Each structure stands twice: as C-alpha cells, then as structure tokens.
Amino acid sequence: MTLGAAGAEEATGTAGPAAPEEVSGSTGTGTTGAGGGGGAMYVADADGGPRPPDWTRRPADAIRAAARPTGAVAVALRHGDLRAVVTYGSTSHHGGIPVTADTRFEIGSLTKTFTALLLAEQVARGEAAYGDPLARFLPPEALPRPRGGPITLLHLATHTSGLPRLPPGLLGSAAADWFSNPYAHFSTADLLRALARTRPRARPGERVRYSNFGVGLLGHLLTRAASGGRQGYGDLLAARVLGPLGLSRTSCGPDLPQATGYWHGRARPPWLIPGLAGAGAVRSSARDLLGLLDAVLDATPDVPSGAPHGSAPSVPVPVTLRTALVDMVRPRLSLHDGGKRLALIWNIRVRADGDVYHHSGGTRGFSAFAGFSPRHRTALVALTNASPAAGQAFIQGAYNALLSLARPD
C-alpha cells in the first residue's frame, strides 16, 4: 500500500532509512514574486514563455524527464539566495489549467515532516517532552501490549517505536476502496482500538522500522497534548505552523482546489486519511514547501517564509516555532553504516561536503520529494500527479537533482 513513495525513506531491520540509490543523472511566463528568506522568487512555466533561470534548467528538466509525459510537475529550488519555481503541464490529463507555483498536490508521507515540526514546537512550548510515554496521553486500555520499556514520542518520531508499518485492522477496512482511498474509512477510534491490540515488533528504541501507524499515532497524541483532543490535527497544524509561516496553500483536506491525481494512469479521488492524518493528510504547493524549507535553512525568519509578496503579517514568527525549526533537524540517531542518520522524521545522508536532508511521499495519485543542504543553503521540492511506478523514478530524479545543487560553487 502506498503512503509515501517510500523507497526513498523506508527502513527495516537495523539499517534504517535508506537514501535513494545515488545513480548518476542529470519552463512560460516569468514573474517575480516574494520567496522565502527575504529573496525574490522567479516563477516560470516551462511549457512556454521566457526561459527559466539557467541555474534551474538542468535539475528541473531532469526531474520533468523522470515524470509521466502527460503529468503535472512543479519544481521549487533554492541555491543560496536564488529561488525559483518551474512548472510543467496542466492540473489534469484532460484539460485542466496550467500548473503554477501555487497548485496544490497531495504530499503523502511528506506530511510526517510537518508532524515532526509540530512535535518540536510543542516541546518548545512545554506542552510535551520527547521522553513522554504514551501513557501520559492515553488511558491504560488503549496502550499496546508491552515489549520492553514504554514507547515515547521520540520513538514515534524516529521510527523506533517497534510498531508495525500499518495498524491491525486497516487492510480489512480498506478493501472496498483499495485502489482509490484505502485509508478513508479508518477513524481515530479505529486507530486507538488497533493500538490496544498491537504488540510491538521490537523493543522501543531497538530498531528502525518505518511506520505510518507510529507517526499517525504521534499526530493524534499531539492534539491531546495541546487541547485534550478537542482540536483536530489539521486545525492544530494550521494554528501552530502553517499560519505563522504564511503557508496559505497548505492544509489537511481537499478544502481548496488541487491537481487531479493519477494512479496507473487512472484519475483518483482526493485522498482521505482521517485516522492517521499526521502520517499523510497534507496537501501543499511548491511555493509553500519551499517556504517551509527556507524557514528551516534560515533558522530564525523574521517574517513568514511562504507569504506572498505584500501580504506577510507584521507579527514575527513565534519564538517557540523558531526554536522548533532548529530542533527538528538535529540528528537523533546514527545508523550502523555511518552514512545515514535520522533527525525527527527527516533522513540525513552524511556527506563529506555537507549533509543532505530528505524525505519523500506519495498517495494514490501523487508523488512528492523535499530535501535540503544546510551547508550550501540549498533546497529542492518536486511534486507530480502520478504514482506509483513513475513515482519511484521521479523521487530518484529529484534526489539526484538535489545532490547536483548541493555542491560548492
């Protein structure tokens, strides 16, 4: 089941999340708008009009070549103080409108990076601690069967909880909508019932095992930490992260227009994942996701990174969120081969010329990638409306393009 073009980040055993294989591989109307971090952003439609900036053409075209010929593609790039969004195609295979920097795509497991930031923000506020056990937020009857010590929030955010990839009972509820919306009928109540009948596959902290179950649970626990569960994940994320960063095209539901997703070439309905929202519910745009990465790279932004030109509110980003942006990317685990680490959710590829952070995602119809290099102040976002097979090549192409940017000038 797809919740993430996860070849880029899934892990089993003790090896941890693997980067995509490092294989070699290698724009319309241009307008100037506001980008993150205080610099101008160039926006170009690659299917006609002025040429995109030269520095974007090779990575953006390589990503486009890895996508389906009829697909919608949006690529956002940052290199130092240079920013651009390059778009290709239309929002559907049969007409639609041209893709723009603000076209919304489902981002699947990239949602987990937002959940990581929300966790770090709540820790900075003092509402939660990384070492908090599940028992702080859940009644005894909802806890999983014990195996070793208690599962903590940090275990959930580093895929070391021992929980399986998917909750027990999910496959049964997904049968009727397997090819379109497999998570649509799995509720928060189902999540808690599944947790109570789960025995972890390993002792907490012992092994890295990629788990949608675990991060979906984390998203729910954060709502309990903030409001006793009265506020849903989407509303909490909007209040604590999306609003303060000015990410106005990002949300957890199909409340705004979005591109049409295609799975094996067939149009799919909007993705619904009510019970595991923190693992895969977010929709976003290339501009907004680059704004998020700008905020991470710049660490202490004075105004929201993703806000359109002229609309940034005068209220500074809260101190707790600034703290969280730094804390989220601090390495937490060093994996046994020495070449990979884990932050909160983010995978880290250790490189002599500067570490690269990355994550990918996918739904029944979309594939997404985001990554950045703090040393080189480089970031890349790639979004397309196709999955699954094309998504793997697309994710690999995006990862390779990020590596090509994250090099000394």
Please provide the spans of the model-predicted regions.
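Intrinsically disordered, low-complexity terminal tails and inter-domain linkers enriched
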Residues: 2-47, 298-317
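Short, gly/Ser/Thr-rich active-site loops of penicillin-recognizing serine hydrolases
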Residues: 42, 331-340, 385-409
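Short, conserved catalytic-motif segment at the N-terminal edge
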Residues: 51-107, 127-129, 354
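Active-site SXXK
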Residues: 63, 81, 106-134, 215-225, ...
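Short, surface-exposed loop or secondary-structure junction motifs
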Residues: 82-85, 145-364
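Short, well-ordered beta-strand elements
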Residues: 84-87, 358-359, 368-386
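Catalytic tyrosine of NAD(P)H-dependent dehydrogenase/reductases that use a Tyr as the general acid/base
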Residues: 105-108, 208-210
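Short, glycine/proline-biased beta-turn/loop segments that scaffold the active-site neighborhood
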Residues: 129-144, 245
